[in-house]
């Protein structure tokens, strides 16, 4: 979907509208309001951070004075001012992700596409990137694709669940959690029972509590002896119910 919106993939049918107008007919006018952070890190190894961002701002047609101001502010907000003269190849994975987030925000785009922005990062860097996205999302449409549910649980207004290229459901976090309130239960079991449970149900977390194995089951027809956990639902439960396996 992101490749279609960014016109990196040609459409065979359908339409994509921005303010009621087809984006292909808008051409450059739409590209000027679009920022894109692809999943694969793309940069020039020997360029410094500052030079890389200025180079991309020129490609975007951003006036030099505006680019200078935006780069300075964004480097400060992402805590990268101290490394702005270092080569891209010398940065950590998290720093590179922050630089790529900056380039997506150059020109003050109204639509920002972020494809797996925290992939491969440690928990600390993932939280940092997530918080930056939350801060920069004010006044923008941010479309974030991720398999890490914690990335979106606290910052998204709407969550789109897609499977095999088709939209399965679109709702807020609260509405999605409510939709599986009676679809998630926990069942104490012996470890030897897990293979059988996995063959019959969608099994989420398996935990040990007070010396006992507890399996989290997701689905429509769950064992009556299992315990409802409607007060402790997560987006992982939503993911398992709607997207894992056949439904």
Regions found by a protein language model. Name each.
Residues 6:
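Helix-to-loop junction immediately C-terminal to a conserved catalytic motif
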Residues 14-25, 29-30:
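Conserved ABC transporter NBD signature motif
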Residues 54, 58, 65-83:
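Conserved ABC ATPase "signature" region
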Residues 87-91:
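Conserved ABC ATPase signature
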Residues 101:
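Hydrophobic anchor residue at the start of the ABC signature
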Residues 112-116:
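Catalytic Walker B motif of ABC-type/P-loop ATPase nucleotide-binding domains
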Residues 128-216:
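ABC transporter nucleotide-binding domain
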């Amino acid at each position: 979907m992101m490749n279609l919106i960014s016109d990196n993939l040609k459409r065979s049918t359908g339409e994509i509208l921005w303010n009621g107008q087809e984006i292909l007919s808008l051409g450059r006018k739409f590209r000027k309001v679009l920022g894109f952070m692809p999943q694969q890190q793309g940069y020039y190894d020997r360029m410094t951070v500052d030079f890389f961002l200025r180079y991309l701002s020129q490609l975007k047609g951003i006036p030099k004075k505006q680019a200078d101001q935006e780069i300075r502010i964004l480097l400060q907000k992402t805590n990268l001012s101290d490394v702005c003269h270092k080569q891209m190849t010398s940065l950590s994975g998290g720093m590179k992700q922050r630089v790529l987030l900056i380039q997506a925000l150059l020109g003050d785009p109204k639509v920002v596409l972020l494809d797996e922005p925290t992939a491969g990062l440690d928990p600390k860097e993932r939280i940092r990137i997530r918080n930056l996205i939350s801060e920069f999302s004010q006044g923008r449409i941010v479309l974030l694709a991720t398999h890490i549910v914690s990335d979106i649980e606290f910052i998204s207004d709407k969550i789109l669940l897609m499977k095999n290229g088709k939209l399965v459901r679109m709702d807020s976090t609260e509405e999605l959690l409510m939709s599986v309130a009676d679809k998630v239960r926990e069942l104490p079991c012996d470890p030897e029972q897990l293979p059988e449970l996995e063959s019959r149900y969608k099994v989420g977390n398996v935990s040990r509590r007070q010396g006992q194995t507890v399996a989290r089951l997701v689905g429509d027809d769950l064992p009556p002896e299992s315990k409802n956990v409607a007060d402790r639902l997560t987006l992982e439960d939503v993911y398992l119910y709607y997207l894992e396996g056949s439904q």
